[in-house]
Amino acid sequence: MVFSRDIPSPASMFSTYASMMGYVMIIKPMINTIIPRPVQNFVFSYLKSFAGSRSSTLTLTIDQMSSMYIPDELYAAAQAYLSTKISPNSVRLIMARDPAEKKVKLYLSDGEVVSDVYNGIKLKWRFLARNKNNTMVEEYGQSYQGNIQRESLELSFDKKHRDLVVNSYIPYVESKAKEVNNKRRILKMHCYSHMAQTWQSVNFKHPSTFDTMAMNDDLKRSMIEDLDRFVGRKDFYKRVGKAWKRGYLLYGPPGTGKSSLVAAMANYLKFDIYDLQLASVQGDAHLRSLLLATNNSSILLIEDIDCSVDLPTRLQPPTETSQPLGAVQVSKPLTLSGLLNCIDGLWSSCGNERIIIFTTNNKEKLDPALLRPGRMDMHIYMGHCSFQGFKTLASNYLGLSDENDDTHPLCPDIKHLIDGHVLTPAQVAEELMKDEDADAALEGLVKVLKRKRLEPKKCDDESKMKKLKEGEEAIADAELAVLTPAQVEDKEELVASEYANVMPEWLPRSRLVMVLPGFHRARGIRRGLGDEM
């Protein structure tokens, strides 16, 4: 039994507390004076770690970005996995609707906790989002300052299950995330943003497929077989010691379907596309950082590589301009060797299942280093529209059957007129879109084909007339400039150089002798040929 006299009065308790605080205020300055601050910090940290080590909970942190500012694949996999674990009892969620989708998506909000159970082990996921005042200094000399939101996930569990979680649960999360992503797979088109200093993406909804491509059937079949063989040979590439990548060079006139073929490849493989504009790359180091930030199972596209940027070669080093003392150092420009090292050198192995595509309108203008054997695995010529391509386009736009060659009375005429370099697939598609009626559309196409057939003859006639006119003017200039044999003896080299610029290559030698008899006789006498010339 507790008596009231055993309980201290409030006054005595307050007096005791005041006395203790007085002792602390006296002792604390003495401790700070006698014991150095580093020693105090060490003692406090040791005591804190000793007290914390008694906890049985282990927490693993997964950051959104790695130390090299590269998106962490494990973080993306965990986000996809947790999207299927959101409980109806969740308190805070983020709701968003993608412009290209109909469904509303729910995401974890800051501080939200999701519970999970794996093989009897209880685990807790916690989402964290924090803003940081960060100054990012890039190696190419530019800096950006602002509030940057860094996201992370914390996974907490009993520390005795650490090996099981790391070796079994995490791979399980990655496999489930892959299944989720395949079900809700939305292709993305990525481009580099100067403001964000990273890749930014939009949904890729291009309708092009191999079925809609106006290509030769054999070439189309060869492309599909090559892509299937590539994605299924992971072990083969590892066994032979090659990076798991594939390169394609698409070349041909404008409007022949190079970009549409890239879209068809992306839709067939379900690969994202990274559209790399070389003009936005500020050096070899910047290019490496951009390629390291791309995901696996993707397509790297560099369009119009012949005219996108002037790449210095090893034989043509970039010119260095002098800068004032104290000025910001500008990085060296992008070089051809830097590009080749990234797509075909040691850096190309930093990724798996990647496809690299170059497009150009003029293959002959490319540097020989880009065309050497083994650089790009396949060179695909995208030429003018053939009759087979026309049948595919007629089936797409007019609904005509492409099984035989006489689905329409005008097909034989079109087959005869379209052979050769007449129209590109884009031009044929433009004509077929002018009218929904098949008869009217095909009649218009026949008229265009006939007109295009006549244009080369007209151009040849005009070219011949132009050459004839140039020849007559050259002959007139030569007659006015004719020299005497004595002048030729003294200044033969000067005369020869003048006439080399005046005379056309196609002018017959007999005509030259008639115009310049003294000139040729003098050269003949000098060389011991007499009048035989």
Curated annotation (Swiss-Prot):
It is found in: Membrane. Keywords: ATP-binding, Hydrolase, Magnesium, Membrane, Nucleotide-binding, Transmembrane, Transmembrane helix. Pfam families: AAA (PF00004), AAA_assoc (PF14363). It comes from the Eukaryota. Its main location: membrane. It is a single-pass membrane protein. GO terms for cellular component: membrane. Belongs to the AAA ATPase family. BCS1 subfamily. ATP binds at residues 252-259. The keyword Aminoacyl-tRNA synthetase does not apply. Coiled coil: none annotated. SMART domains: AAA (SM00382). This is AAA-ATPase At5g17740. Its EC number is 3.6.1.-. It catalyses: ATP + H2O = ADP + phosphate + H(+). One of its GO terms (biological process) is response to stress. InterPro entries: AAA+_ATPase, AAA_N_dom, ATPase_AAA_core, ATPase_AAA_CS, Mitochondrial_chaperone_BCS1, P-loop_NTPase.
